[in-house]
Amino acid sequence: MVAHLNIHTSFDLLDSSLRIDALIDKAKKEGYRALAITDTNVLYGYPKFYDACIAAHIHPIFGMTIYLTDGLYTIETVVLAKNNQGLKSLYQISSAIMMRNKEEVPIEWLKRYDEHLIIIFKEAELSHKQIIDAFEGKKELYLNHNSNNTLTGKRVWMQSARYLNEDDAETIPALHAIRDNTKLDLIHEKETLDEHFPSIEELQTLNLSEDMITNANEIEELCQAEIAYHQSLLPQFVTPNGETSKDYLWTILIHRLREWELNDKTYFNRLKHEYKIITDMGFEDYFLIVSDLIHFAKTHEVMVGPGRGSSAGSLVSYLLGITTIDPLKYNLLFERFLNPERVTMPDIDIDFEDTRREKVIKYVQDKYGEHHVSGIVTFGHLLARAVARDVGRIMGFDETSLNEISKLIPHKLGITLEEAYQKPEFKAFVHRNHRNERWFEVSKKLEGLPRHTSTHAAGIIINDQPLFKFAPLTTGDTGLLTQWTMTEAERIGLLKIDFLGLRNLSIIHQIILQVKKDLNINIDIEAIPYDDKKVFDLLSNGDTTGIFQLESDGVRSVLKRLQPEHFEDIVAVTSLYRPGPMEEIPTYITRRHNPNQVAYLHPDLEPILKNTYGVIIYQEQIMLIASQVAGFSYGEADILRRAMSKKNRAILESERQHFIDGAKNNGYGEQISKQIFDLILKFADYGFPRAHAVSYSKIAYIMSYLKVHYPHYFYANILSNVIGSEKKTAAMIDEAKHQRISILPPNINQSHWYYKASNKGIYLSLGTIKGIGYQSVKLIIDERQQNGPYRDFFDFSRRIPKRVKNRKLLESLILVGAFDTFGKTRATLLQAIDQVLDLNSDVEQDEMLFDLLTPKQSYEEKEELPDQLLSDYEKEYLGFYISKHPVEKKFEKKQYLGIFQLSNGSHYQPILVQFDHIKQIRTKNGQNMAFVTMNDGRTMMDGVIFPDKFKKFETSISKEQMYIVLGKFEKRNQQMQLIINQLFEVEAYEQTKLSNSKKVILRNVTHLEPQFEHSKVESNEQHALNIYGFDESANKMTMLGQIERQRQNFDLLIQTYSPADIRFI
């Protein structure tokens, strides 16, 4: 016997450690002829198992373990598919089990599908006779070798295999402990296990009967199911009048061509070309299906992106409304998207606004029906950090040890435990004791195994037949899922469309709706001008916070250097700012400003590379060069591009010769042909799809346009989308203030959960206030909308429900200014809280009873709280300052010291800051240093204080104080940071500065005020301080006199003139 009929792979989640690759390797070495995958209830591993078996020339058998019940007794049962019909039966049984969350399978379910299945009962006892008899007369029915001897039936050897070798037995109790969240009793549980994958030699020692061997061979011969890949499973689109999809598609396309007045012959010829390829390849239904769902979205208040990926290169997509990018206008190639030489399903991914994406999915589900639409499964795995903690937990490690493990494993994508072991600290931990060594061994054996299922973020499968006919289904958080991954589902021929949710589309849509509601202006984003100077000024200034694709510090730096003037500049920046092509950015910018420096390897390359100043940026440029120079069809050119990006040496050499031969046939010399090939080879690795770049640059431009022309609405919506992120909110608030947009305190009669734009400024969200949850805000707003604005603080307190009214809520609202609209100081309102909390709640809810039975409420007027305290409360409850930041206030008062802000400071200039975060660490040498986050009231920046500077302040440095810092600016991870060399408390710095000053300069002052007469001194006095007036308009300095160097005179100067107009030098 050379078949194993009962293998549980690692896709039997947390119940097997048998990896398919390792299983097949061992099976091949041992000489196994056939293997059967029999995971319990699920078929997750089928495609991977099938592919691995075929590659190793092993006969794959498809099966499943189920627990069959007659309602009284249950028996472990293995069912195997005889043929492809049996395979479909397994799909349907598994789907039913997973969709109905069944642990046991009723006999009736199996009997419905048993015609094309082999049934093997395991460890059958007399109590199971009724279940076995239910299948009386079925020829392909077996009992396994250790079933009760008194039962009649054909016998076959069948023993579960759940781990590879005998010494892997410990993996099963470990997996079970992880699954059940229990502690691991390794020694006890290992003794009971005997489920390794045996060698052929071990099978031979079992002395199996001839009947068992014959039956096993018989089963192997009977099982001939195969997974059919690349089936034609596209659903048919139902046309309105019963005409063919081809005819219906052509009718729509011609109508749109005329309707949009695209009468140029080039459009018609391009349309005929694309239509022929699409219909020849049988994809007309696909385009109609996608067009239909996008049409639904656009007519049901769901914003759709202009395009995504290479599909924006299709004129058919444009005419159907799938994209809003005219491919001829932007010189985009259809063949980058679809061509006859690359016979794969076209890939149209769609961006929807993220808050309404589910509406479109619901439409598709309703249109195609139950079981016809599903999401796609993904698997979470036991990766290094997770498996290390899981195994540590089940082995009883305390929290300190678990945290130590987490710190010892580097934060690196794809890190393995073996790689972590190369670090001395990790190795020392492993060998600290025997328990840690066992922990490491068990963790390594489990590392990488699938742990749980999840849902693919975007993929949706659609068919006009129930999906369980083609693949097994399961359920996830969002509904039905295929049990197979995206790649596997697509490979069998199922239609997959990515429904992606894009937050920026939601922001754009909300801005459009609010502008219409408040200003009665209809913004048609398809009609905005793409040569708006204000937009390009914004981009050139790098004011791109909140702009899709353009808001990182690195991109802003590029925009400032580039000074974009055309839409094409945006397309280029979004394509270049990625690892790889970034190195071409300086070249691109230099040539953009100096076009005369552009040189082309050959004149024929100029029309293709002119827009990008001789730099190859886009994949389409590679295809155009291959077509122009070597005479490649665009399909051949796309194959060349793909071969270049994959760097397959054998294919590359073949394509190189193909290119050179084609170029020579076109009249190019061999040397220039080689040079051009090498040129495109250099850029092929990171060339970007131009169609995608144009699509996403359009979103970036639209957002920039809205930011320029409707800034209040732009910032309000960006802020609404970062509620919950204190850091992002603070940064956006600071920028809005910098743009001179008023940020208004929360207003109990104006604010909502989201930020609200108004002609006065932007009202803060009630949801921003710490300690006030969504339900409380909802109740406050609902009451206001139903019964009108709140009249005063007492009216508010009476009308809100008792379950949300408490001291914490009222204090929070008062201290952030939500009741300022009523004209009372915050101190007065705080004094009134006790009054409103003492009232009888039942009386409050009845306005008439309230007026009759309660004494007249009155305020005890109090002076307002000090400015600093008000600011502190704002920071405490909001995470940022609404009014001027205390550092900004201090800066305005102390400008006479010649201090700077983070945004305009240079190396070693004094900058006034406060530390928002201080992270103290110990170096390898045992010295303390600190990483800090600095705030100057407008800008936040990270900083470093090294040990030699930090030791002076490590016991006194505080987030409550302000400091003057000096240091060197450096870029780290594309972000500026300050290496702090000197740090002073403000008072100490001021005292030193004033004491050492030699002169004072007064801006735009021509003479000293009379009050300084008594302070004047003769020029030869030792303690004299020279006073100069500086005339800005004339750029002229004039000596105004001298005063005695005394603190009282300094203070008099500061009181008499604006701090901004004084500089002590």
Curated annotation (Swiss-Prot):
It catalyses: DNA(n) + a 2'-deoxyribonucleoside 5'-triphosphate = DNA(n+1) + diphosphate. DNA polymerase III is a complex, multichain enzyme responsible for most of the replicative synthesis in bacteria. This DNA polymerase also exhibits 3' to 5' exonuclease activity. The alpha chain is the DNA polymerase. Its EC number is 2.7.7.7. One of its GO terms (cellular component) is cytoplasm. InterPro entries: DNA_pol3_alpha_NTPase_dom, DNA_pol3_alpha_thumb_dom, DNA_pol3_finger, DnaE2/DnaE/PolC, DNAPol_HHH, NA-bd_OB_tRNA, PHP_dom, Pol/His_phosphatase_N. GO terms for biological process: DNA replication. GO terms for molecular function: 3'-5' exonuclease activity; DNA-directed DNA polymerase activity; nucleic acid binding. This is DNA polymerase III subunit alpha. Keywords: Cytoplasm, DNA replication, DNA-directed DNA polymerase, Nucleotidyltransferase, Transferase. Belongs to the DNA polymerase type-C family. DnaE subfamily. Its main location: cytoplasm. It is found in: Cytoplasm. DNA polymerase III contains a core (composed of alpha, epsilon and theta chains) that associates with a tau subunit. This core dimerizes to form the PolIII' complex. PolIII' associates with the gamma complex (composed of gamma, delta, delta', psi and chi chains) and with the beta chain to form the complete DNA polymerase III complex.
